Design a protein with these regions (language model features):
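C-terminal transmembrane module of polytopic alpha-helical membrane proteins
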Residues: 1-16, 25, 179-241
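Cytoplasmic-side transmembrane-helix entry/capping segments in multi-pass membrane proteins
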Residues: 103-110, 138-140, 163-171
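Structural signal for the C-terminal ends of transmembrane alpha-helices
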Residues: 2, 32-34, 94, 151-156, ...
């Protein structure tokens, strides 16, 4: 019980980045437990994934509208969640040096939403996806919104990467987006790459166009995380990655 209490305390005292990491990890562990029991009973599809991942059809979205957000908290396997959460940790903490914690949550959720929307549009428009069906999971669209959003705001910020040295943030963002563009022709995860680009596009357009950098639409949702008031501090000019 002491471990559980320790986790609860860490969650309560953590910033929004840490809270999102804990939530994603908890859901991933829950999914693994369901998969174990599903295998024991020879089930074909994990019911949790089926109900909370985003299907590629608009008709399915009408019956399960929550999935355009909830898919952003599910992950396919351990490497998938590991890469996403490592990126979220470093980029997310950089983001809240310049924006508020509520804004980070807004970018995560809205990036997930617009990523899911582009995923649906691409699957129902491009011939590449004809005759195929898929389910979308992963936090990458929301993380892409955060990554590209903060890059648009401070493109020349320099990250210190071990064994490499200082690298401008926009170089890393260009690689991040470039890999998704190259992946659009893939027959295995093209839909996922469209979702990532949808989140990235939202992050870029919003920061590029907004005059006050404020997002208020998700204030009610963000209040559920009981985030403490952000303490003013000087922004760091380098960060280990």
């Amino acid at each position: 019980m002491s471990i559980i209490n320790d986790i609860k305390e860490r969650y309560k005292s953590g910033n929004i980045v840490e809270k999102l990491i804990y939530i994603n990890l908890a859901i991933f562990i829950f999914m693994l437990l369901i998969s174990v029991f599903q295998d024991l009973y020879k089930g074909e599809i994990n019911w949790f994934v089926e109900w909370f991942s985003l299907d590629d059809s608009f008709s399915s979205l009408l019956t399960k509208p929550w999935t355009i957000i909830t898919y952003g908290f599910l992950h396919a396997d351990f490497p998938h969640i590991l890469l996403n959460l490592i990126t979220l940790y470093f980029i997310g903490n950089l983001f809240i040096e310049y924006f508020t914690q509520k804004q980070l949550l807004s970018f995560y959720l809205l990036g997930t939403f617009f990523g899911g929307l582009l995923y649906l549009l691409s699957h129902n428009y491009f011939p590449l996806f004809e005759g195929s069906s898929s389910l979308l999971v992963g936090a990458s669209a929301g993380i892409s919104a955060i990554f590209i959003g903060v890059t648009t705001y401070i493109p020349n910020y320099q990250l210190k990467i071990r064994f490499i040295g200082f690298v401008k943030l926009w170089y890393l963002a260009a690689i991040w987006v470039g890999l998704d563009i190259l992946g659009l022709s893939s027959e295995t995860n093209a839909g996922g790459h469209f979702a990532h680009l949808g989140g990235a596009l939202f992050g870029f357009l919003y920061v590029n166009q907004a005059s006050n950098k404020e997002l208020n639409i998700w204030n009610i949702i963000s209040s559920l995380f009981t985030i403490k008031k952000k303490v003013s501090r000087n922004s760091k000019m380098e960060q280990y990655f």
